[in-house]
Amino acid sequence: MEGVEEKKKVPAVPETLKKKRRNFAELKIKRLRKKFAQKMLRKARRKLIYEKAKHYHKEYRQMYRTEIRMARMARKAGNFYVPAEPKLAFVIRIRGINGVSPKVRKVLQLLRLRQIFNGTFVKLNKASINMLRIVEPYIAWGYPNLKSVNELIYKRGYGKINKKRIALTDNALIARSLGKYGIICMEDLIHEIYTVGKRFKEANNFLWPFKLSSPRGGMKKKTTHFVEGGDAGNREDQINRLIRRMN
């Protein structure tokens, strides 16, 4: 009987197997904790992005109301309201460059306008305005409004990530590249560009040059200036109409 009882005894679990089971259980707990932490982080980030969007919307509305109020006050006093000098331009290359001077080629390269119907944002200052004058016969440019900036970035926005052109389908892509500058989402990127913020250069360099479509209805006269009924040169606020036709 004793022999039968000994046979029925459950064999002891090897120590190595116990250790494996412990390690597996610990690993599972770590993974669950990490997953939970990531979930909470995503939730917190979504909330932050929502709050930022609300704040920017309020800021844009305030800017618009201030402009309206200033114009109204000027009219009331019998004066003309002169808005502040624009700080932002959107530049579109409209012509090829066969046979042009090396200087024009160089400026177009600096503006990152390597192909016809490429577009880029430019911070306006004395140096950049001089550059635009040099290449004016080959570009159409003007002052984009908030709607244009918004639609360009949302519809045609690509980022330069590891020297590759990547579609901005996720805020995480922006956060990874520009998070160190406090830019973590599309709304941050749009705000930095539109207001020409302190990190405009980094935000603008992150954006790949926009590849626009040929304008609906075609172009009138590429070689003639806009003020003479053509397409080239500074069209001020009218650039927004051209953007609509090409976006």
Curated annotation (Swiss-Prot):
The modification Phosphotyrosine is found at Y138. Keywords: Acetylation, Cytoplasm, Phosphoprotein, Repeat, Ribonucleoprotein, Ribosomal protein, RNA-binding. GO terms for biological process: maturation of LSU-rRNA from tricistronic rRNA transcript (SSU-rRNA, 5.8S rRNA, LSU-rRNA). CDD domains: Ribosomal_L7_archeal_euk (cd01657). One of its GO terms (molecular function) is mRNA binding. GO terms for cellular component: cytosolic large ribosomal subunit; endoplasmic reticulum; nucleolus; postsynaptic density. The modification N6-succinyllysine is found at K126. The modification Phosphothreonine is found at T16. It is found in: Cytoplasm. SUPFAM superfamilies: Ribosomal protein L30p/L7e (SSF55129). Residues 7-53 are annotated as: 4 X 12 AA tandem repeats. The modification N-acetylmethionine is found at M1. Sequence repeats lie at residues 7-17, 18-29, 30-41, 42-53. Component of the large ribosomal subunit. The ribosome is a large ribonucleoprotein complex responsible for the synthesis of proteins in the cell. Binds to G-rich structures in 28S rRNA and in mRNAs. Plays a regulatory role in the translation apparatus; inhibits cell-free translation of mRNAs. Belongs to the universal ribosomal protein uL30 family. PANTHER family: 60S RIBOSOMAL PROTEIN L7, LARGE RIBOSOMAL SUBUNIT PROTEIN UL30. This is Large ribosomal subunit protein uL30. It comes from Pongo abelii.
